[in-house]
């Protein structure tokens, strides 16, 4: 029962991930059909959250071993996180729609800077969904590196130097992500 809930949550995570990727693409090229698809996927994620939440609460009322009880508790929190990620797809879509409606376009530099941010978001979402699906704690521990690095770049103004930013961001990201796990992480 817990394994089924984990699998369904992984499917929910994938829908949220795809929705954000599609919504980000709408800031570059508006497409009414794709926009509707993003809305539909977000609605499906909401349905997953409702159904999984109900199922997990019922499951938690049963007598479970310690590991299953912890898994159910984690899943209850995780479905909310994935639902919030999916909500961001609609926020991105709404911004893209406003840009399309008002015929607002990014400058070349702004597009390059946005691409760095989008690449980082895609990397985080890919790692997050992959780590969750595989239940890989080592991979999950690497997810936080990318947003922290990106935040540091934004704070220091590096994000404003688009051509340098992309090269430096990827160099630092790859260096940080390639570090070997500590003996404690190896299990």
Where are these regions (language model features)?
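Cytosolic, long alpha-helical scaffolding segments
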Residues: 1-176, 180, 184
